[in-house]
Amino acid sequence: MSPKVAYISSEFALSDELPTYAGGLGILAADLLYQAAESQFPLCGISVFFHEGFFQQKVGPEGKQEHFYDRIDPLKAGLVDTGQSVRIPLTDHEITLKIWRKDVSPTNKPNNQSTSPLYLLDADIPENTPEDRKFTDRLYERVWAPHLIDDLVLGVGSVRAARKLGLPIKVWHINDDHGTFNIMERLREYLEKGLSFPEARERVKAETIFTTHTPVAGAESKFSREEISFTMNALFNGLDVDPEEIWNLGKREWEGEEVFSLTVFAMRHARAINAVSRKHFDISRELWKFVNGEIPTAYVTNAVYAPRWTAKELGKVSAESTDKEIREAKLQAKKSAAETLGHLAYDKRRFDPKALVLVWARRFTEYKQPALLVSDLDRLVKVLISNDKPVYLLMSGKAHPEDPQGRSFVKQVIDASRDPRLEGHLIYFPNYSLSLAKELFAAADVWLNTPKVGWEASGTSGMKAVFNCALNASSPDGWWAEGFNGKNGWEIDPPDAENVYGLLEKEIVPIFYDQKEKWAAMVKESLRSCGPRFNTPRMLEDYRKLYGI
């Protein structure tokens, strides 16, 4: 099956052996590939093979985060050399990109021979200079915003790789603005064929879908006139187009200066622009209204590929299961997770699988409020420590190496976990990964999420918790703003310490221990109301309608 849709993303989170992802962007991209394979939908992914991926985390003896990088073995990661390569222009010379391929198969249908290919671009080859080979070493090494050259490799390289491989792509889906130079490269192609610039723009727009992920003003990729001019000269030199016209199509004001926004440029060259949740859609339409009407025209709420994330003990549980079936399956999943997690904890502590288990696991950054739960240890002791109603709080997540505040949050949580008053009921797990996340989903009775409202575009971890018979307690943001119905979990509004502690004390702990029938009813309602809506078959169908395929 030849792919007709190319999904361009800087991250794909396929496995721990191929950690070319930093977070939710990559998990979303990978889950879409899995679903496309299962549904036999003609979609491929194109990204970059970062040889050291994203950083690995460890915790030093003083409780401080340390980071290091492991070199990825392409063969162990399941990559296959296509034998093909392409060249792309930089500011003053060209580099060669090797093309790797990885086939993604559905996880729950072993007899399904359908696969979705992921193509990865690689500059670390002998044809390039030692300096140029480093361009595909590390993902987001210094700052969260991608570097200009990283974007060139992904954007320009994705088009040239598809052409070299003979892929009959009809629709280009740009997942966030990291792939925007894909649009510029296709403009260049049409100009070389003799089309006028307006004609080239119309052709490109007709074949482009753009997904925006940021809900925050100014958080997109932005470059100065000097930075972007080198790129435009490299791509459009000798063609009938005014560089100033291209600049104006991406220009925006930011902090008193004119900058080139990749998001603005992408929005002006896409026939469909989608946000990733209903709330994000509302925020985005206000956020991008200055782009002359080229604002998000739809929303496709993110979803997860459930077979990939559901513990095997819970694979047959549904909203129609009996209370006893749900309780027994969940306990078995927790027991299995407890055994594995005991070896992964920072201090090798273990939790009692029969106790109520709370989990908070995601990136340690300010807007997600990772230290909220440990902001009042006296109160936390009252929640966690009880002879007849014990509670465990499991936490995990990395802070970017260049985010000192995030790193301080990690230390704050680890310091709290050492407080003797908590008796080992707060456990931190370093080096958050896909495999660790799966164990935490299986362990969780309640999945906690505390972002500042308006800052979470969607989020998907809580969706995975649903399929593992965990209940969500979250800020009314992202996907939970449309998932919560008053009977399938809890809303933390506003997401402050008093509300979290109060909710745990007055509702969550008493219901878990004293109202088992109500707890089971809430789990069933969560499965019934959220399962079909936040599963990738629905998401792929929504995108299929946008693709027109």
Report the location of each language-model feature:
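Catalytic cores of carbohydrate-active enzymes across secretory and cytosolic contexts
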Residues: 1-549
